[in-house]
Structures are given as structure tokens and as C-alpha cells.
Amino acid sequence: MLELAHKLADSDAKFFGGWVLAGVEAHIHGEAVKLENNVLLAKERKAMIQVLGTAADGSVAKELRVFLVLPKRTLGTKQADAVAAAGECVARHVFTAQEIADYVAYTGDENIIHKGEHPIVPGLCMAAWLECELQLKELDWKLSFLSPVYAGDELRVYDDGEKLAAYVGAANVFVIK
């Protein structure tokens, strides 16, 4: 996941500064020898970018599709709706500003929302952490990001058998199907 995020950062940082990750499709089924970015959609306030990883035989080994939106309002001004968590808590973590800075340095993600005194945790940083935490070698995920997670927030991930749902307090912040 991290190598896909690193390649994604090759996208035009000036164009995508301030944009937020609304959703991700991630498919990992082996090692990729070549990665390439493809802009599938680029509009005034929404974009879709694909990172495609091919194996030595030319088959698709990894794919990441990100859905980005440019918010009309300032982030953090609307509280996420409170929802009761269902299922078993399978992972929890508090991301620090240093972890975010390390992720940004490694991937090259220069988005302004991941910097400053109270940075937003990059969505792909959370996805990569969860991939490692669950010790996954392969995955097929559709992630929907519902609300930002900030440095210092405790993120808890629950598995209800059909999906993974992440919470900060009582707010559902992302879902993985």
C-alpha cells in the first residue's frame, strides 16, 4: 500500500493541495515491478487517479483508485454523526504528528492538510497501518472516508463480519467493504 501511495504523490501537488480523500479502491495481489499514474477524471472540485502496478508478466498485481474532492467549507467545521460501533474491535491506534510527518516524507504527499499544528491523518496512511496491523498479504478494499481524523485522535476499527468500520469517539470516520 505504501508504494502505491508513494507513486500517487507524483501527481501534481499544486493542483491537489487542500483536496481530501473521499474514497479508495485498493487491490493487492502480488509484487509489482512497474507503477504508473493515470488521471481518470479531473474536474474543478473532484478527481479520480489510478495507480496501476504490473507484475513481470504484464498482469495487474496492484491497483489503487483514489477519489478526491475539494471541499467548499473548511475541514473540521461539521461534526460527524454519532453511530454506535458494531462488532469486535480489531485494531486501535493514536496517530502522532510525527507519524504523519514521517508518512508525508516517505510518500512525498505534500498536501497542506497533513501539515501544521493539528494535521489530518492521510487516509492512505491509515489504510497502510491497518493493512500491516491485520497482517494482510492480499486485499480487495473499497474505503469510504466520512470525516477527517486528526493527530492525537484515537482511531478504533471494528469488524462486524461484513465490513470494517473506523471510529473516533462515537463518530464513524471511515468504512471498508
Place the predicted regions along the sequence by residue.
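HotDog/MaoC-like acyl-thioester-processing domains
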Residues: 2-3, 14-92, 149-153, 158-177
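A conserved acidic, glycine/proline-rich C-terminal tail/linker
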Residues: 133-156
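Hot-dog-fold acyl-thioester-processing enzymes
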Residues: 1-29, 71-140
